[in-house]
Amino acid sequence: MTRPALIGDIGGTNARFALVTPGAFDLHDIRTLPCAHYPSLSDAIRAYLKEVGAEMPTEACLAFACPVHDDEVRMTNNAWRFSKRQVAEEFGFTLFKVINDFTAQALGVPHVADDELVALGDGEAAPGCTRLIFGPGTGLGMAGLFPGQHDWIPLPTEGGHISFAPTDQHERDLLAYFQARYGRVSVERILCGQGLLDLYRAHAQLAKQVARYNTPAEVTGAARAGDPLARNALERFLKILGDVSGDAALMLGARGGVYLCGGILPRLLDWLPHSHFRDAFADKGRMHAYTAHIPVWVVTAPWNGLLGACEALHNEEVT
């Protein structure tokens, strides 16, 4: 009997694990482990396998929210680091793939059900064209995806670390706030959970008011309750999200559509359709007609990254 393969999607905050029949997408024994509770990746894997009572898998594909091109992988938003070679030897994996988390998000998109996609505005996907997968969580992920002759071909990027480009005087004032705190300001500094909180604090400072909220969830809750500063921060967050995702769609030529993933946006579905996201996405000067026709969806599938790791396991385009 074929042993199940180990599948993982590891972010800065949580590690999600599952088992799957190699070559299939029948996820089972899905668990979410807080990264901070485990000193290392190996400890988390062992804890997961013990919890679900599974035999040691011989195949594994794990996705991480950080660069993964070297043998030594260092997480960007938590303290884990490991050697791919040593982990494969430690667990006896005969097949061990390590991919970027947004490579996994990209590869998961073709396997998402239609009722797990929420359209933002109009647009029609061009067949056979590149897709953009983009979204904020603990950090900001960005990847491309296009159909190859036999398999889906992912284009991993670290596009979340491109420089933030303000589009009006208010954003130039916000940039000055972020520069005072961080020096160089990447778009990830703004388009992530901590970035939403920082945007709120920046709005408070610019308005010469006291910031009352201390977590992104508190800011979102206050915005829903009508707090003007929190509301302005959230609306600006979504407008900048449109700016950056529209720029990324131009860079990749993503006429196949834009898929917004991550832990934040599915919780903002009541805000996104009424925000300036879509206008900012399309507002690209001479390229307005190009971006205006690109469809955008929010992916609500809870385990999209795990589905992508399943796809990657035996996808010959993913090494």
UniProtKB/Swiss-Prot annotation:
Which is an annotated GO molecular function term of this record? D-glucose binding
Please write the reaction equations for the catalytic activity of this protein. Answer: D-glucose + ATP = D-glucose 6-phosphate + ADP + H(+)
Q: Where is it predominantly found? A: cytoplasm
What Enzyme Commission number does this protein have? 2.7.1.2
**Binding site residues for ATP:** 8-13
Q: Where in the cell is it found?
A: Cytoplasm
> A Pfam family in this protein?
Glucokinase
Q: Which UniProt keywords apply?
A: ATP-binding, Cytoplasm, Glycolysis, Kinase, Nucleotide-binding, Transferase
Q: Name one GO cellular component term.
A: cytosol
What protein is this chain from? Glucokinase
Higher taxonomy: Bacteria, Pseudomonadati, Pseudomonadota, Gammaproteobacteria, Oceanospirillales
